[in-house]
Design a protein with these regions (language model features):
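Conserved helicase motor core of SF1/SF2 NTP-dependent helicases
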Residues: 2-40, 46-243
């Protein structure tokens, strides 16, 4: 059986003032592509679920929600958050893991809401593990569920490493649009996300969904308008810049 979420304790007046554990609600599919994504996340026969699409399409919150349900239902030991190394990490104060908190804070906030527990407690007892890609090789995450965000920044070699760590299931999110292409990966021709989509697309144990419609963007008001209008323009600009 997996570990149960910890009981929340807080002075009542503080709880009423700001209950961060209720900041986000269960994600609800809003479009046909969302529905397909949720069905794949719920389908335990799909060991790897890949969502490729624009920002604002609820990729991350949906993956985290179903990962949390897997832990709460005793189907997984915990959640492993996999992230690419970012510039300047070594200059930040704190322990190795503390340096990574700002990079994954939004995902941890989702986890707090869906597991009703402070993320620091979950990190302490390894119900949640932050795994920098740099140190992934040689690890064994049998029994865990992995969540990989910003997969377009990962190399093909590291994507292979991720998929061979023995996790119960792996939820991989990313965006293969030119705007999100990594300059370093341009030298090898493709990202790990593109490599995985090309080599494993016909596998029956892998589910793939592409958020390729404007209606898939669920951000409110002007944010959606910015994504819809600016992303294509930025992609064109970036393509011209490379040529």
């Amino acid at each position: 059986m997996g570990k149960k979420s910890k009981e929340f304790s807080c002075p009542k007046e503080e709880y009423v003032k700001y209950n961060r554990y209720n900041k986000y609600e269960k994600p609800v599919p809003m479009t046909p592509n969302h529905e397909k994504y949720h069905n794949l996340l719920k389908d335990k026969s799909k060991k790897i679920v890949i969502c490729n699409g624009w920002a604002g399409t609820s990729k991350s919150i949906s993956a985290i929600y179903y990962a949390c349900q897997s832990v709460l239902n005793g189907e997984s030991k915990g959640i492993v958050i996999v992230k690419e190394l970012f510039d300047g990490a070594g200059f930040l104060p704190g322990t190795e893991i503390e340096k990574w908190i700002p990079k994954v804070k939004q995902l941890l906030t989702y986890i707090e809401c869906f597991m009703q527990c402070d993320y620091r407690t979950l990190l302490e007892d390894e119900t949640v593990v932050i795994q920098p890609l740099t140190y992934l090789q040689g690890t064994d995450y049998t029994g865990y569920i992995m969540v990989v965000d910003e997969a377009e920044l990962i190399s093909p070699e590291m994507m292979y490493c991720i998929c061979s760590r023995g996790a119960n299931r792996i939820f991989i999110n990313g965006d293969t649009s030119p705007l999100q292409a990594n300059e370093k990966l341009a030298k090898v021709g493709k990202s790990g996300l593109s490599f995985l989509l090309e080599t494993m697309s016909k596998s029956t144990s892998i589910g793939i969904v592409t958020m390729d419609s404007e209606e898939d963007i669920v951000r409110d008001g002007y944010i959606k308008e910015i994504i819809v209008k600016m992303q294509p323009a930025l992609e064109e600009f970036k393509t011209r810049k490379r040529s």
